[in-house]
């Protein structure tokens, strides 16, 4: 059965105390060791189970005008492929609506390497996005 938004998962803004949950999703990455105990701001979107404390994915929004950004998409390992695809699609859709409401005229997006294909397909096919080039990301601790 196809996963259903609202029944099998919901997309919502992360609560300010959910930093440790996001840290767990980023396990074995360079950002795992940051201080995730500090209160989060409103820029994090999560896909979660509506009935139990189960977290599927996280995405960071950068609301800026005229170009907003979607960054750091991370999906929990081991979730079923269909659920993974639906979660990624709906998180992107939710995030684009939020950025449009903020006043962004365009959005750029970046994803971790193993999600590039899924992320790119959703942006291109569902939202008529255009690839703008290859990027190499860098992380600098402040």
Predicted regions and their residues:
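Short amphipathic alpha-helix that is part of the acyltransferase structural core
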Residues: 1-35, 141
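Flexible, charged surface loops at secondary-structure boundaries
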Residues: 5, 38-41, 101-103
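Short alpha-helical
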Residues: 17-21, 65, 114-117
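A conserved beta-strand-loop-helix scaffold within acyl/acetyltransferase catalytic domains
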Residues: 26-44, 49-50, 56-75
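Residue-level detector of high-confidence beta-strand sites
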Residues: 56-58, 126, 134
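Acyl-donor binding region in acyl/amide transferases
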Residues: 68-132
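C-terminal "cap" of GNAT-fold acetyltransferases
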Residues: 130-142
